[in-house]
Amino acid sequence: MIYPMFALVLLTFFVGIRLGSARFANARSGRVKGSYYRLMQGDVPPDSEVKLARNFSNLFEAPVLFYVTGAIVIAKNLATPAVLALAWGYVALRLVHTVIHLGYNHPIHRFLAFLASNALLLALWCWLAYVL
């Protein structure tokens, strides 16, 4: 279970580093005033930066429930092939969501990836509630 969790951590750091790089580049080039980043007010960042910021924020919402599930599975030694398949499926769908969000950003496609990932997360929690 640690490997799917680690993969999601890597995705989160990847998006976070891209966001930091975009903010630095936008401030350095003058596209966004550096003072904007103090309170996130007073300027309008480019759409590409907004997408990165929203995606980074998304990675601290529902995935928190995934990390809790993973920690319980590890602590109780409950990992099974089915649980690992659900976990990897969840991580894969979060990756798909990120690729769509930061790429062509079609809302319906992004929502379907979000919905499917949350269905797997709910399945993990239902299984966990059943076995505990």
Task: Describe the role of every protein-language-model region.
Residues 24-31, 79, 106, 130:
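Transmembrane helix-loop junctions in multipass membrane proteins, especially transporters and channels
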Residues 123-132:
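Juxtamembrane boundary at the C-terminal end of a transmembrane helix
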Residues 80-91:
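Structural signature of hydrophobic alpha-helical transmembrane segments
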Residues 96-120:
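Interfacial loop-to-transmembrane junctions
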Residues 57-72:
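Core segments of transmembrane alpha-helices
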